[in-house]
């Protein structure tokens, strides 16, 4: 599959199942903590500055944003989790919306789960990974913000993350930086094998 990253549109921002796109394109969901760099990851992969809206305010993505990539697939931007300044009720609502999508959507082929390479995975990161493994959803684990860690320490940080998450070696692990473009090719290779 060849992807023309110049052909991009936003299909819909969906709050529930009845709003999901009706075509049968494969979907790759992107999940991670607020401010882990999801929008930057999408923009870097697609070589666009502001396609996915980046926000200085974490917790801005409150719907499932379906991005049409070259009329061939959707990237589905899932609301960032672990954002404290959102009411418990609001978080529960997001949780139900995310769970409904991840457990019932037949078009879903894999989830890009993003973690910050600088820190041990949070409880939310661990729960998300366990959830995806429980439902047998393929995971591409992406450690973002690699430019903030000296290259010589990448292996150490990778080991810490994998150990904390009880990483399944059948999943992909990619070190990524939207600043210096590390990991773009590896990310596309991992995504395309699920399509």
Curated annotation (Swiss-Prot):
Binding, Mg(2+): 39, 61
Signal sequence range: none
Ligand binding (GTP): 32-39, 59-63, 77-80, 144-147, 176-178
Any one GO CC term of the record: cytosol
A GO term for molecular function: metal ion binding
The UniProt record lists the keyword Cell cycle: yes
Pfam families recorded: MMR_HSR1 (PF01926)
Gene3D superfamilies: P-loop containing nucleotide triphosphate hydrolases
GO biological process: division septum assembly
Matches recorded under InterPro entries: G_ENGB_dom, GTP-bd, GTP-bd_ribosome_bio_YsxC, P-loop_NTPase
Key word Transmembrane helix present: no
Domain EngB-type G stretches: 24-195
Keywords in alphabetical order: Cell cycle, Cell division, GTP-binding, Magnesium, Metal-binding, Nucleotide-binding, Septation
Swiss-Prot/TrEMBL cofactor(s): Mg(2+)
SUPFAM superfamilies: P-loop containing nucleoside triphosphate hydrolases
Role played: Necessary for normal cell division and for the maintenance of normal septation.
Protein family per UniProt: Belongs to the TRAFAC class TrmE-Era-EngA-EngB-Septin-like GTPase superfamily. EngB GTPase family.
Protein name: Probable GTP-binding protein EngB
């Amino acid at each position: 599959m060849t992807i023309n990253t110049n052909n991009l549109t936003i299909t819909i921002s969906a709050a529930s199942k009845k709003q999901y796109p009706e075509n049968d394109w494969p979907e790759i969901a992107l999940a991670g903590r607020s401010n882990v760099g999801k929008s930057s990851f999408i923009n870097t992969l697609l070589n666009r500055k502001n396609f996915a809206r980046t926000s200085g305010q974490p917790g801005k993505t409150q719907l499932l944003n379906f991005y049409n990539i070259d009329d061939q697939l959707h990237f589905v931007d899932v609301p960032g989790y672990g954002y404290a300044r959102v009411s418990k009720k609001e978080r529960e609502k997001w949780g139900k919306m995310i769970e409904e999508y991840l457990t019932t959507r037949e078009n879903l082929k894999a989830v890009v789960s993003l973690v910050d390479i600088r820190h041990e995975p949070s409880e939310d990161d661990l729960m998300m990974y366990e959830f995806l493994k429980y439902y047998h959803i393929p995971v591409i684990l992406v450690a973002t913000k690699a430019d903030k860690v000296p290259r010589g320490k990448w292996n150490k940080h990778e080991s810490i993350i994998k150990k904390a998450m009880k990483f399944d070696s059948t999943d992909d692990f990619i070190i990524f930086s939207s600043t210096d473009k590390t990991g773009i090719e590896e990310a596309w290779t991992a995504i395309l094998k699920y399509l």
